[in-house]
Structures are given as structure tokens and as C-alpha cells.
């Protein structure tokens, strides 16, 4: 088992014997992808020097720079208020043949040559609804979740903060919005159920049952059992319905995990106690898991890409804004702290 941890100060790898020396020390790593073919990708956000993408064919022993997604020039006279410039590579996924990249300011890109070149998915970028997308945690909108149906890789669902969820059935040639049933408490009453105004924090699907999806939304937890055609509000979650991260078991669509927090005002664990919420029955009930987690003076926030489950469905790991990293080998019943001294963590992935 390898665990990849992207942080504000580099990429760390835990290979079972502890955490190794950092790669790209000092550079913010916004996303990492351990691809099924053994290739490792790391996205760096170097601020003034731009977004960079690194690729390794030997598990991180050596790295080479490959192309980062690039936006075309904004057309003359365009009224688009969103800049046509890459701000961050926020999501990175593979369907086995193609790479998919979600970015801020809201463009989706694809590569068919392992990152040597990228193409903007214009069919989504040119949707008129995009003009209404807005920034959530950032100044501009962004695609942070790319859920690929393993049984039909041409079916993708992406989530936008803030711009709802969008789905393609034909590999990106056409798109339809798919956030029916979600609600936005921050909008005026007449726009509460506007699908294009939904601030989804994270969206995942169950690989064995891809029609079942889970979403952690700014205003709650939602679940779909019909491939995102409709969403149901999951009200049983505790100790709060706010959070960023969600993970679903690879084979059991009813088993999912969340890391709740206090919404908006201060964004810390409820009562300063770090817990994980788990459901085994599709959201009808939840267990609050705390064994091995700090239960006083815990101010750890777990970002949307910082909770992951491995392919067996037994191991989970999550990292926090305060540099804490925890591992469970029994589906969350108990947790072991791997570190409390890492830089703020941006993403955690098994590989």
C-alpha cells in the first residue's frame, strides 16, 4: 500500500514504513494521480510561475515535466467575466486511456497522450449556463470532481463549485445538468433549487454500482441511485451536515464516510472534536467514529480531496489543514495517527 499526500510544501509518500522525504519541497501540490498503468502525476501551483504538471514512471524516483492544460485566447469582444487562464489544476482522473483534468476557472481538459498535450472540452466550456457559475472557496468557479463510470468510460459526471453537476453520456461531446433535488440555502427563495447554483464540495460514485453517487454539498449531504438524474437529501448525518470530503466503498454503495465540520462561521470540527461520520445503510443512519482521533482542541479541517478509501474498502486515510494524517485499517472503527507535523494537506490518495 502506498499513500500519496499532496501538501502546501510538497508531495509526500507513505509506503508502509513511514513517510518519506518530500518531492518538490516548498511547492504547493494541488493534486496527485497514481494511474493504473503505474504512472504518477503531480500538479503544482507555483503562483507567479504558473501551474506545472510533473510525471513519473518509476514511483517518484525521477520526474519529468509535461504540458499543463492551457486555455485558448479569450475572443475579442467577449463579455465573459471569467479569465481564460489556468489558475489551478484541481482534479485529475484517468479512464485507462485518457486523462481528465478539472481546473479553476471551470474548464475541463482531456489528454490522450499521458499529458504531453491537452484539449479543452469546448462543449462544456461553451455552455451558456457557465456565465452564471461563481467561485465558492476561490475567486473563480472550478471543476473539482470527475466521476468516471468504470463500466462505461464515456459517461462522466463532473461537479463545479459553484455550478452544480454536469454529465456526459458520449465522452464529452454533449452535456446536461444533473443537480435535481439539491438546494442552495444561500440563494434567494426563488433560486433555491436552481441546479446551476448548487455548490457541491465533492462528488463520488461507487465503482461497482456507478449509478449510486454521493455528494457533500455546502448545505448538506445528497445521494443519487439513478446515475445523478435525481438527488435525495440525507438528513441523518451527524454531528453536522457541513463538510468537504466524502468517500464511498468501492463495492458497497450504501457504505460511505464524511468528515463533518462547523459551517461558514469558523470551519472547525464540531465542539473541537475530530470525528468521521459513517453510514452503512445508504444514509438512513450514521455512526460517529472517534477512536484514535483528537477529542479536544482539534481544529483540523479536511478539504474535499483529503479523504480516500483504498481498493479493498478496508483502509481509509485523511489529512487536515493542520498537517495531521490518519489511517484506518478497519473501515473507520479506529484510527492511527501517521503524522501531526506535515504542511497543510491538499489531497490524499491511495495507489
Say what each PLM segment does.
Residues 1-351:
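Extracellular glycan-interacting surfaces
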